[in-house]
Amino acid sequence: MEFSIKSGSPEKQRSACVVVGVFESRKMTLPAELLDKASGGYISDIVRRGDMEGKAGSTLLLHSVPSTLCDRILLVGLGKEKDFREKEFASAIRTAVKVLNETGAFDASIFLTELPVRKRSIAWRVRQTAMIALDATYKFDQFKSKKEEIRRPLRKLTISVERRNELAPAEEALAQGLAIAEGMAMAKTLGNLPPNICHPTYLAEQAQAMAEEFKLGCEILDRAEMEKLGMHSLLSVARGSHQPPKLIVLTYKGARASEKPIVLVGKGVTFDTGGISLKPGAEMDEMKYDMCGAASVLGTMQAVARMALPINLTVVVPATENMPGGNATRPGDIVTSMSGQTIEILNTDAEGRLILCDALTYAERFEPDTVIDVATLTGACVVALGSIATGLFANKDALARDLLDAGEDANDRGWHMPLWDDYQELLKSPFADMANIGGRWGGAISAACFLSRFTKKFDWAHLDIAGTAWKSGADKGATGRPVPMLAYYLLQRAGKLN
């Protein structure tokens, strides 16, 4: 889809469709009023009759409105004006784009971006509109032999700004929003791919292709190289699989060489059976999504490279399958991590932390400013937070606040979870430095505590996305989260968030 920014009055738009809003109860927004005036009260007559009440999520498509230059006008219900905030704005944009895609209009001009959202700039509104528009039209159907094609899909969206002095910040925000949306789409596609295709080698190939396209540094470590580094915790997870494990490293240099990099570490378990501690068969297919942490950091790297942010960024992805087999790790095995700390593996289905701990130790060599790991780590986090908020842990409160703020800005929220020393007691082992599980209670916290033992040399945050990385049910599929949160955080760090 093509996007453009324009400043102008709605009644003067030569477009296949113009989109304007109506609040409850039947209160037209200024762009709607301008169209109504041009049409001699045609729209207000329809609204008065009750065809459009302004309820949130409602729409009404009008054809050939008198004395207007557009073919169609789409009225979008916005709900109560006093309640119109970020969530309502996003919902209105998503509704509008989905309906537009089915109207037969090749191009449209959207005036919802002119609506004030408390404490949000025009740049925020445009950036969000671009992100939502691409996300709303995303489809994953490459394995369908018969695809459901939209006869005349929307091909061009013009985003309106009220004043000409808003054009420059809106153009910059549009480019940012499209880059973030494309990063989300990449993360979603990697997550949605079947595990017989998206295995560790495939992930490595995608990273290499991205490195070539965006002139990134790329290094792929194989099993032998990881053995030399002493990554026995990571490799213990790979022992049951015929698919070779990979450690994927991408580097982006947008700032001075002296500036310390931010490192993103993404869990890349491309299929998780649980290993010898086998999962139940029901819904095991969804364990292809256990690499969504890897997908999200790769998508974030793509977004940063597209935006050409003035930062240094490194992405590390430990990638493997977790399979049962004659050579698979057993409950009770003890391994030595790259850090030298020993781990008693009481449950082979708590494998994410076993690959992440070695990746976090590996990250030390970059002398990072900050390290953020992203992982579909624990079912306990889903129990605690459901599918709304990502679980956020950090060894520095300031870092946690920055990520929480980024999540609020991006409509990709997180919740700050405790990382108190009291919980470290849960990981005690009589035979090794630590166990890889901490018992039934506080599972998301004990998992984060485990990882914290490998992060003593840098500021670190952990995002548990087990509840937010994908959806089940009728809308089954990867969500692309937390690419928006991470991208907004990096935009803020780069001083490019308006």
Curated annotation (Swiss-Prot):
Mn(2+) 1 binds at residues 272, 349, 351. Its main location: cytoplasm. The active site is at 279, 353. Keywords: Aminopeptidase, Cytoplasm, Hydrolase, Manganese, Metal-binding, Protease. Its EC number is 3.4.11.1, 3.4.11.10. Signal peptide: none annotated. The keyword Nucleus does not apply. GO terms for biological process: proteolysis. Its cofactor is Mn(2+). It is an enzyme of class 3 (hydrolase). It catalyses: Release of an N-terminal amino acid, Xaa-|-Yaa-, in which Xaa is preferably Leu, but may be other amino acids including Pro although not Arg or Lys, and Yaa may be Pro. Amino acid amides and methyl esters are also readily hydrolyzed, but rates on arylamides are exceedingly low; Release of an N-terminal amino acid, preferentially leucine, but not glutamic or aspartic acids. One of its GO terms (cellular component) is cytoplasm. GO terms for molecular function: manganese ion binding; metalloaminopeptidase activity. It is found in: Cytoplasm. Binds 2 manganese ions per subunit. Mn(2+) 2 binds at residues 267, 272, 290, 351. The keyword Protease applies. Belongs to the peptidase M17 family. Presumably involved in the processing and regular turnover of intracellular proteins. Catalyzes the removal of unsubstituted N-terminal amino acids from various peptides. This is Probable cytosol aminopeptidase. It comes from Dechloromonas aromatica (strain RCB). The lineage of its organism: Bacteria, Pseudomonadati, Pseudomonadota, Betaproteobacteria, Rhodocyclales. The gene is pepA.
